[in-house]
């Protein structure tokens, strides 16, 4: 099982945590949503739960709840800028289908 984070994503998460002034890392999860069934969830973590799986890459802790891990195993979290838009991108090898807008996926 693995989760990785790109250099640009690590820099962005570190900057957000520093600006926020607290936090242990970033929680990455999935929830039921959208036309393809699942959507990614990102949130800052102040506490790690007993069933959480913690990965550390490039100095950033990425926390995954046990239920989401099956959908996220092997995912790389990236931060990209495309024109005037910027945001986190999930390079997930488990995805079999995405909706047209790219907001939800299926495995």
UniProtKB/Swiss-Prot annotation:
**Can you cite an annotated GO cellular component?**
cytosol
Q: How is the cofactor bound?
A: Binds 2 iron ions per dimer. The dimer may bind additional iron ions.
What InterPro entries does the database record attribute to this sequence?
Fe-S_cluster_asmbl/transfer (IPR050322), FeS_biogenesis (IPR000361), FeS_cluster_insertion (IPR016092), FeS_cluster_insertion_CS (IPR017870), HesB-like_dom_sf (IPR035903), IscA_proteobacteria (IPR011302)
Q: Where does Fe cation bind?
A: 35, 99, 101
Look up the record and name the cofactor or cofactors this protein needs. Fe cation
UniProt record, GO biological process: iron-sulfur cluster assembly
The identity of this protein, by name, is Iron-binding protein IscA
Source species of the chain: Yersinia pestis
